[in-house]
C-alpha cells in the first residue's frame, strides 16, 4: 500500500518524469524499443511477401506439372491412335 502511494507520487511529479525522460538510459530504451518494433514490422512484411511468392511459385509448379501430364496424355493418345490407324491400314492391305 505504501509502495503504491509512493509510486503514484513519483509518477505525478512532472519534474521527475521529465528528468527521467531526458536521461540516457530511458532515451536508449526508447530507441531500442522503436528499432525492435520497426525491425519486427519489416520482417513481418518480408515474410508475408515470401509466403505469397512461395504460394504463387507452388501454384506455378502445380500448373506446370499438370500441363506436362496433359501433354504426356495427349501424346500417348495420339500414339495409340496412330498405331491403330497403321494396324487398320495393314489389315485393309492384307485383305
UniProtKB/Swiss-Prot annotation:
InterPro entries the UniProt entry points to: NCBP2-AS2 (IPR042407)
Origin: domain of life: Eukaryota
Name of the featured protein: Protein NCBP2AS2 homolog
Organism: Ixodes scapularis
Amino acid at each position: 500500500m505504501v509502495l503504491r502511494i509512493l509510486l503514484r507520487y513519483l509518477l505525478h511529479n512532472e519534474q521527475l518524469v521529465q528528468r527521467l525522460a531526458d536521461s540516457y538510459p530511458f532515451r536508449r530504451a526508447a530507441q531500442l524499443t522503436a528499432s525492435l518494433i520497426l525491425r519486427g514490422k519489416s520482417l513481418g512484411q518480408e515474410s508475408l511477401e515470401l509466403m505469397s511468392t512461395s504460394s504463387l511459385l507452388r501454384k506455378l509448379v502445380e500448373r506446370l506439372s499438370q500441363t506436362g501430364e496433359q501433354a504426356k496424355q495427349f501424346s500417348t493418345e495420339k500414339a495409340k491412335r496412330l498405331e491403330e490407324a497403321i494396324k487398320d491400314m495393314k489389315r485393309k492391305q492384307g485383305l
